């Protein structure tokens, strides 16, 4: 069965974080992802 063409309906954004080890980069990224998912109706993936 052939797959249908994927239509990207939302803009794609790459975000980079730079910082020292154990200074909260992952925590900050997870918080931003969760807040934006709630605000714009998306789904945050772990």
UniProtKB/Swiss-Prot annotation:
UniProt binding sites for GTP: 19-26
SUPFAM superfamilies with a match to the protein in the record: P-loop containing nucleoside triphosphate hydrolases
Gene Ontology MF: a single term: GTPase activity
Keywords: Cytoplasm, Elongation factor, GTP-binding, Nucleotide-binding, Protein biosynthesis
Residues forming coiled coils: none
InterPro entries to which the protein is assigned, alphabetical: EF-Tu_GTPase, P-loop_NTPase, T_Tr_GTP-bd_dom
Homology family: Belongs to the GTP-binding elongation factor family. EF-Tu/EF-1A subfamily.
Subunit-structure text: Monomer.
Protein name: Elongation factor Tu
């Amino acid at each position: 069965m052939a797959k249908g063409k994927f239509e990207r309906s939302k803009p794609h954004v790459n975000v980079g974080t730079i910082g020292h080890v154990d200074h909260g980069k992952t925590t900050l990224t997870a918080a931003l992802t969760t807040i934006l998912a709630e605000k714009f109706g998306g789904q945050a993936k772990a």
